[in-house]
């Protein structure tokens, strides 16, 4: 599944990198997603990834998030409800990352 509206931005806020993704994250763009996460994580011992505007996330994206969580303190911003929030629970990402919900 590919969405032409996939966008990725990285910035530093309060000494910690923040990566914001929108649209679908899947095999077509997970390379860019993973590279951005790795570069951001190299800048700090913690990283925040805002997934609140992500509409779809496949297992390759989950794997990229687990890879970052293995070496860096990871915080994820997600909608209060929906498929991305459900995916965090099913995959176990909610046990290795701090999850912040947004309405």
Task: Locate each region found by the language model.
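STAS-like cytosolic regulatory interaction modules
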Residues: 1-103
């Amino acid at each position: 599944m590919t969405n032409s509206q996939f966008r990725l931005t990285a910035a530093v806020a309060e000494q910690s990198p923040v990566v914001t993704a929108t649209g679908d994250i899947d095999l077509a763009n997970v390379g860019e997603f993973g590279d951005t996460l790795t570069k951001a994580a190299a800048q700090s011992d913690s990283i925040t990834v805002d997934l609140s505007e992500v509409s779809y996330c496949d297992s390759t994206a989950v794997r990229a998030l687990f890879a970052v969580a293995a070496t860096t303190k990871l915080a994820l911003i997600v909608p209060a409800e929906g498929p991305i929030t459900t995916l965090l629970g099913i995959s176990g990402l909610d046990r290795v990352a701090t999850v912040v919900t947004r309405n």
